[in-house]
Amino acid sequence: MITYEIPCLLGLEKLVADEVKRLGLQDVRAENGHILCRGSWADCARLNINLRCGARVIALLGQFPAQSFEELFQGVRAIAWEEFLPQDAAFPVKGYSISSQLHSVPACQSIIKKAMVERLRAHYGIEQFPETGTKYQVRFSVFKDQVSIGLDASGEGLYKRGYRAVGVEAPLRETLAAALVTLSRYRGRDPFCDPFCGSGTIPIEAALIAKNRAPGLDRRFDAQRWAFLPAEAWMDAADEAQDREFHGQYDIWGGDIDPRAVDIARDNARKAGVDDCVRFEVADAGKFHRDSPYGHLVTNPPYGERLMERQEAEELYRTFGKAWRTLPAGWRTLVLSSHTEFERCFGRPADRKRKLYNGMIKCDVFMYGNV
């Protein structure tokens, strides 16, 4: 059994843990900023292909205490790296240290690399490693003097689904968009709307959820090139994911006042394979209205920190709030914003709030209705 670590945005731990449990992995534990679980090497492929809200998948190969560089060196050297890394492997080292005696990240990187080279040198009987072959990205963390180290199976972050070649300014990461849709409890039955859709990330993720389409089917992962992980694991995981897809009619809509953003959103939906069930239109959020008695509205309006001045954002919230109050009572609404005066400008306090981070920006999810 392999222990996997799945980093995630702060505030999304329970959502990611629920995803992992649904995939059938064992000993699932949610901790600050990451999930731990246990599974087989075949589960490495299943996690990468299916996770919507996790940041990446790391196969942990060692966990041990270390308060000195000697303890770090010995702990890393004790790991059987030769079972995973071929002679020509490229093995760069990345990581971080928090609240630990070993606080210098560059020094930790150097010690870890040195320990790995010594272990591999003893096995392969060579002095120099060319590192011209497949990349095996080593990732470590040192938290309160406890070291975790392993191989990054994802490569590029899982938010890179492969459908967004270009975007508009200040895009929302796909993993966070999927989390917002999940928090709204959207399942594909009711209308779904995003009146500030930008490059279309939230409606596209809603469509992937409605169709139960795995988000990682259209991209590559670093672990697909690892010699010890059979190609059949990836093919089986992809087949399993495709067998679970739904095919139906969905009412998913995105609007934005910027015509260029709408063009980009349509192109991204086509790349994601959901252009048959998502409509994008040039529209003013201040005039948004729907007559359907039930629906889901999930949106990420400008915060007034990057795209527009704070006063402009507040006026936008006021006009959008007036339009929102014309919706039937059965609508569930989630708005992601970092603006501390959002509720006052919007014209109604949230029924519930949840703290999240959009990149480095601390935000609240303002929830209205039965969510």
What are these regions (language model features)?
Residues 1-134:
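Non-catalytic nucleic-acid substrate-recognition regions in nucleic-acid-modifying enzymes
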Residues 172-290, 305-306, 310-314:
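Conserved S-adenosyl-L-methionine
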Residues 8, 256, 337:
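Short beta-strand/turn micro-motifs composed of small residues
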Residues 98-101, 157, 302-306:
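A short, flexible beta-alpha/helix-coil linker loop
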Residues 138-154, 366:
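C-terminal edge-of-domain segments
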Residues 149-185:
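SAM-dependent Rossmann-like transferase core, predominantly class I methyltransferases
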Residues 284-287, 291-371:
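C-terminal catalytic and target-recognition region of SAM-dependent MTase-like enzymes
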